[in-house]
Amino acid sequence: MIQMQSYLDVADNSGAKQVMCFKVLGGSKRRYAGIGDIIKVTVKDAIPRGKVKKGEVYDAVVVRTRKGVRRADGSLIRFDGNAAVLLNSKQEPIGTRIFGPVTRELRSEKFMKIVSLAPEVL
């Protein structure tokens, strides 16, 4: 469950290490984002010579949360931290690699690229 001011790790090689959510997209009063939701983030920590710089604003899709996601069979998939993948203006991933596992809930038309790049799909 991600809300405004939440810090997330970045699960791609775009050059950002940590981002902060400042808006949950999808409704004017929407408060929380879960796995598969798009949020607006600002880069708080970046590596030198990366594709993104500190202070820049991007869209991102949430790929892992501490809260987890409940499946139809009743199982719950949780992670040790919150993570996101940065997106460009066309909603495509900026990085060319994805680090760590992602969930099957991302397998929509929009995020098949992220699922195919991920080393493990849970």
UniProtKB/Swiss-Prot annotation:
One of its GO terms (biological process) is translation. GO terms for cellular component: cytosolic large ribosomal subunit. Belongs to the universal ribosomal protein uL14 family. InterPro entries: Ribosomal_uL14, Ribosomal_uL14_bac-type, Ribosomal_uL14_CS, Ribosomal_uL14_sf. Pfam families: Ribosomal_L14 (PF00238). It comes from Stenotrophomonas maltophilia (strain K279a). Part of the 50S ribosomal subunit. Forms a cluster with proteins L3 and L19. In the 70S ribosome, L14 and L19 interact and together make contacts with the 16S rRNA in bridges B5 and B8. Keywords: Ribonucleoprotein, Ribosomal protein, RNA-binding, rRNA-binding. Disulfide bonds: none annotated. Binds to 23S rRNA. Forms part of two intersubunit bridges in the 70S ribosome. It comes from the Bacteria. This is Large ribosomal subunit protein uL14. GO terms for molecular function: large ribosomal subunit rRNA binding; structural constituent of ribosome. Gene3D superfamilies: Ribosomal protein L14.
